[in-house]
Design a protein with these regions (language model features):
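Glycine-rich hexapeptide-repeat left-handed beta-helix
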Residues: 2-25, 63, 77-78, 84-91, ...
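Extended, small-residue-rich solenoid/repeat segments and analogous flexible loops
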Residues: 2-53, 57-59
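Sequence/structural signature of small/polar-enriched beta-strand/turn repeats
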Residues: 48, 66-69, 88-91
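A short glycine/small-residue-enriched secondary-structure motif
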Residues: 70-74
Length: 227
């Protein structure tokens, strides 16, 4: 249950959050038993489940796509979890996100371990019980089946997935190129090297402009719980 107030709102305890933001008219929804450290940031359409924790310096931001974090999840120091317009983030229960991990627009099932420095890209799906070890990468639109393992520094790419050491550049690129990173993430057609970045940054800047309208929520303000 969320900590209800009259009208179906939720109270934020004084001093519990450092930077809690309304973004695009959406406010975070945080279970009364969850904890967010004083230097963490929670922005926009973010839902945190029972007994979950977001630690110091972590950022959880819904930039056009919602972020759902289940029960008893741990998001550790300086991790980033980012929902994207076409790729919301859904994280199941009992998921551990270690420091400096980066997750954007992905689906994480229950009981997944994401080690320090791991990266999971847009459209990826990690099956229950999977592990991505230190500096491992799960690339765009990649699917890991239940109990999969990405070793230290290796790259998982494709569906069906291949899990490869990082030095196998040519094989990784052969699998990655058809997944169309610029088109999937930025809506930009792939062109010659160096020609896509101006349009990608222009489009991304337009989306990020919405943050100018963010409203910081003070301690004790109420969070709207829809429905």
């Amino acid at each position: 249950m969320y900590s209800a107030m009259p009208g179906g709102d939720v109270a934020i305890l004084t001093g519990r959050f450092s930077l809690l933001l309304e973004h695009r008219g959406k406010r975070p929804k945080v279970h009364e038993s969850a904890y967010v450290a004083p230097t963490a940031t929670i922005c926009g359409d973010v839902t945190m489940g029972e007994n979950s924790r977001v630690l110091f310096g972590a950022v959880v931001t819904a930039e056009g796509g919602p972020v759902e974090i289940g029960a008893e999840c741990i998001v550790m120091e300086n991790a980033v979890i980012r929902g994207a317009p076409k790729h919301p983030i859904r994280i199941g229960d009992h998921v551990l996100v270690r420091p400096r991990a980066y997750l954007t627009g992905c689906n994480i099932e229950n009981n997944v371990f994401l080690a320090t420095g791991s990266t999971v890209f847009n459209g990826a799906h990690l099956g229950e019980g999977s592990e991505v070890r230190v500096n491992g990468i799960v690339h765009l639109r990649t699917v890991l089946q239940k109990d999969s393992l990405v070793p230290i520094g290796w790259v998982a790419v494709g569906d069906p997935v291949e899990i490869l050491p990082s030095h196998e550049h040519e094989r990784i690129w052969a699998l990655q190129e058809p997944l169309d990173f610029p088109g999937t993430v930025f809506g930009v057609e792939r062109g010659p090297a160096g020609t896509m970045t101006p349009e990608m940054t222009r489009r991304y800047a337009r989306g990020l402009e919405k943050h100018r309208e963010d409203l910081p929520l003070g301690a004790g303000e109420r969070l709207i719980v829809e429905g």
